[in-house]
Amino acid sequence: MKYDILEPFKEYLYSQLPANTARTYYAAVNKLFKDIQFNSLEQIDKDWINEKCREQFKTRNEYSAVKNGLKRLKEYDSMLQLPSEDEFHAVSIKKRNRRKKPPKTIYLKPTQRKINQLSDEKLRYAYRLAMVSGLRVSELADLEASDIEINNEKIFVTVKHGKGGHGGKIECSPDSYLQKKLPEFLVKHKTDERLFYSEVYLRQKATELGIECHDLRRIFAITTRNALKKEMSVEEANAIVQQRMRHARFSTTKRYLFNRKLKFEYENVKEEGEE
């Protein structure tokens, strides 16, 4: 059956690639094959693959993920027949670079209130930690009890499997609530036990709250820079934010700090007036 092939392939990807890349490639391949059944990869027609990839994957990044995932699948099982590189390229160049999104506004205080009102402490701690650490949701889901350290009223988080291999130890922004609650939470878990829910579940629950998980990382970048600017030069503050975000280039960090399609406000004035 299909998943007798795909599940071992998933393990193969994780053994060959960084976790985030493996996750992206597998998700794309799994999406492609979602509505078909097969017992062997040689049963899949390469023309069907070409047409289905063209229809299902709208942006260049999405198309690249499924193309590279399929190439890895062929490495894993040579029975798979793929379109030629020229055929892949002919489709790729017609894809737009990214989905067009309307400008959005992130409201800090309403986001914090939504998180603080959560009755599930695992979700509440996870989302608050994301706001003060800048962790991606995949990194948050991977955290074990031994990855969090609290010293001298400071919280440190160790990321072992960051995007692009950029892990490291991160000093979190001050949060007196987490400084008090996390030690009590950590002692309930073994050192190698996952602290929070899966990435899929964290995203799902955030969506139900009306929050995008990556907005918590954006909040971290902006609030950290604003706080640091009061103590040092703008250049020094920018460098520290880049380091804590674990970006190889400041041009990546700039997309969080100076994105013209993104507005950052402390309060939703309309929401406050309506209340």
Which positions does each model-derived feature cover?
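Conserved tyrosine-mediated DNA breakage-rejoining catalytic core shared by Y-recombinases
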Residues: 143-179
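Short, basic/aromatic-rich helical patch in the C-terminal catalytic core of site-specific tyrosine
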Residues: 140, 216-232, 241-242, 253
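N-terminal core-binding DNA-recognition domain of tyrosine recombinases/integrases
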Residues: 6-99
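Catalytic-site neighborhood detector that most strongly recognizes the C-terminal catalytic loop/helix
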Residues: 245-271, 275
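Long, amphipathic, Lys/Arg-enriched alpha-helical "connector/arm" segment
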Residues: 94-122
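Short pre-functional
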Residues: 124-138
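Active-site/catalytic core of tyrosine-dependent DNA strand-transfer enzymes
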Residues: 173-220, 225-227
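Short, polar N-cap/turn motifs at the start of nucleic acid-interacting alpha helices
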Residues: 150, 230-257
